[in-house]
Structures are given as structure tokens and as C-alpha cells.
Amino acid sequence: MAMSGGVDSAVAAARLFDEGREVVGVTLHLWDYAEGTPGSHGRCCAPEDQYDARRTADLLGFPHYTFDRRELFRKAVVDPFVDAYLAGETPSPCASCNRAVKLSVLFELASVLGARKVATGHYARVVRDEFGHAYLAQGRDRRKDQSYFLYAARGDEIERLVFPLGDSSKSEVRAEALSRRLPGANKGESQELCFVGATSAEYVSFVESRANGRLRPGPILDAGGHTVGTHSGVHRFTVGQRKGLGVALGRPAFVNRIDAASGAVHLGDADALARKRLRIEDASLREHVTLPRRARVRVRHGHDEAWASIEEDRGPNDAARRTLAVTFEEPVRAVSPGQVAVFYDEGRVLGGGRIGSAEPPS
């Protein structure tokens, strides 16, 4: 049982224990925070969270272990996060963490500990199609659904995953934690950027502290290509951004495109944010999914899905990785390269990948 020290994993563990499962709690130490660090609550590996995970295991009566995976987390999540922002992209570190760290490490530890299943506190489900094939699926509470971040789970992993909270709402889980008097029952929501902080100033400072001379200043251009300002680095911007641009045009303006090579940040009006076709890199699909096909596609966590066609798009330099082309039936707005696109069919996750580029309607 993966235990972060938060309310969700605590309730998930308690439910499994009530079912008579033989539970072993596992906490991954991924990042360092000094005791009492301001704002560390709700981030990964805050000292009090690791302590609460152990307290929950002790209260319920099952063993708990903490494993140090800080170096892996830095290489697989933190360094690519910084690199992406410096390249003018907007990364999705939670998807990267689940793919490259949490799932791989948890299944590795399950083998060591002799566990047949791996459980987490994610709001997601496992369902089967008419042929008995297992699929990751959206949680019943669509506002908390976390299937987006787990899109890259392999078929053999999905067969062994257990999501005790998949049919619950957050309010139900919170009430249960309080009634059980579980440690951390009153904790607030965890942050998506768990190792950085919630504000743009925090992530900008984080990236700059690790840039090592790679900051890319450049011009800010209006829709006509005229220079209307300058900036100190493309890492300060994301496609669709309106506030904090550092320029005043007398009309609403949004970041339309970021050219990391030249350092130019291109502005436009709201209509200029429309995108029709995406190139998806490092894509993964469930084994039984065939292309081309029509599916609903989500381009950012918390956004609604939109209908699109998906097909192979292998170029001459793509021999080592799978690339796909996604063409929306109606344009979608504010698509950021570096984010993840996830494909759904009636709530089932078909696959997904990193958005490499996004083209406007012709």
C-alpha cells in the first residue's frame, strides 16, 4: 500500500485492512524538506507526512517501510521539469513521477516484499471490457479523477493495481478519515507541484536556481511581430497565460507561442489560442487499442475531453519512440507543449503521451 501520509492513502489503507487484506505500507522518500520549512505541508516527503504514514500503519496494525528514492526522483522528474521550462514547455511532473518513479518502484518493491497487488490512494478505477481486458478508468468523482496522471500504466501493472477510493468522492473520504480518527484527517489538499510550491513565483525561483546559465531572455512580440517588451527567460511563460506578462497593450493579450530557440514570446488574442492538430511524442497505448480511431482527448488535468481522431505519425527520426497525430473535430484552446494528452473511451484510458507540438486550424 503506497502511503504518502495524506488522508487519501490513509483511508485506502484502512479499507483494505477492513477487508482482511494483508497490508504492507510503503512510503517513498523522494524529496528533502527541513523540519518546519514554510509551505512544506502538502508537498511530497514533508517530515510530518512521513510520520503520519507510519502512525496510520501503527494505528491499524500493519508493517510500514520507508524507502529512499531521492536520486531517481531528481533524475526522472525534477531535472526534466527544469529542462522543460527552460525549453519553453509546460511539463506535467505528476504524470512523469507516476510513470518513471512511483509505479516502477512500487512494483519492484512488491516483488521484494512478496505482495501480489499494489494499492494507492488515487481516485481512479480498474474496469474490464467485454473480452476481459483490464483498463485504467476515471474515478467516479470526476472533480478528483487522477486517471490522467496514470495513463502510462502497462497492462500487466493495471492487472495488479487496486484503487480503494475509485468509487468514492473526496468528501466521503474526508468524513471517513475523521470518523476513524486517522492521523492527518484534517490535512488540506496536496499540491500538484508537490516539490516546488503553489505560486508562479516559487516555480520560477526553483527553475532559476537550477538553470546553470541556461536562462533564455528575449523579446515579447505582439500578433503583428512587433516588439512590445522584453523578458528575462522563457521559463516565466506558458501558452494561454494572460497575467504577469510584463507588458500592457491596452487590450487582452495571451501567450500564443514560445520560441525557445530565439527566446521570443509571441502574444495574441483569445482566438489565436485555438489548436486543431497535436503531435504526441513518447506515446503509449493499451495493448488492445488499434489505430486509427476516434476517442475523447484531454490535454491538461482538470480540462474537459474533446473528440478527436488518433493515428500513427512516425517520422524519419522516430524509430526509437512512438509518435501519434491527434486531430480534433473542433479546435481546443491553450494547448501547451510539454503537457500530457490522454485518450479516453467511455471513461477508460486508452493511452496518451507528451504533447510535442500543437498546430492552429488551417
Can you say where each PLM-predicted feature lies in the sequence?
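ATP-dependent adenylation/nucleotidyltransferase module used to activate substrates
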Residues: 1-151, 162, 170-173, 178, ...
